[in-house]
Amino acid sequence: MSNNISFNGYDARPLKGIFTRDGGFGKSFYGLAAQTAEILNKEGVDVFVQTPKKIIKNDFSDIKPNFSNFWPWVQDRLAFFPNKTIESKGFTREDTNLKDIKEMFSLPIKEIGNHIEGGNYFFIKDGGKDIVLLGKEELSIKKPKSIQDFFGKHKVMTLSQPDFHLDLSIRPLNNKRILVNDPKMLMNGLDNGIKRAKEVYAKEKDSQLEAVIRKLNYLKDEILESNQEYDTLNKYKTLQQELKYNKFNVIKVPGLIIKPGNGVVAGQPLFMADTKYKMNFMNAIVHERADKSLVYVAGKSVLDEQLGLTPEIAEKIDFSFERIFKKSLNGIIAPDDIHFVGDKTISNILKNNDGNVHCLFAEIPKY
């Protein structure tokens, strides 16, 4: 593999560990790290968190959050290569303490000037070789030659990106299977949930359920307006067609609800700027076991709670956004192997900072 390649995103592969940094998200960030460690440690996967003082592995119970200049989205800044090197976006104020990383993992670190953020591409196994899936918007801010130089001899396949980065919209698994957010599937699931809630309410006249129905209808109107304004359905349809044309197995899932903002991100189209995510189950960590089964770790959304979808009500009407996401993966990932991590505080922080679990962690492959 070429030393010129800087990539952070993988399809589902066996992991040795995942690495993140204390980017100033507070105590609840460590709670998310601890939950993730509890899940992945059972699979033989370690979770590393870098603080301003040291790197801690797996046990975060006694940590007191401290201020740091660390950039929180490690996925976009740091890459653990299969050729046993680490590459960083640059030795900037947000990328201090790289020496600690080098010593912890006994790997050399290399600075990359011509950097492409890891959230906008994935390496995918295709016929035993790695190819690159790259968000097409990179072509608007980088020259094709610089992109090819960046990825070396590897084939680069550009894809339409409905969102700021590809890892916010798709999640590659293994065997060329790719989860793709599907707004139409989400809307169908929401409609069915509203229908069942109305049927139960007609029998029970439960005031809590009445409030849930009202909130679900409001959310539906909000999603429809957003889909129309930003042409969401056509964007995802185009992406799915591109993947199918290139012989990927597209698995549609109801994994994302966006609330586009009005800000501007340098070098990015306006429609993708300052996006907020009411729910994002796409931006996830996936570990492949020896038997090829998968463990899926996504960030928990506060949306179900905000809608009043308690476990009891969700069971009664057979609907919540976590439930319909799990159901969409029947026969692909076992329900007990799909996890949603984080508390209300960190979920809101991630939602308001335009990222989620995959953005937080850099994956360390088994060498």
Stretches found by the model and what they are:
Residues 4-367:
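Histidine/cysteine-enriched polar flanking segments
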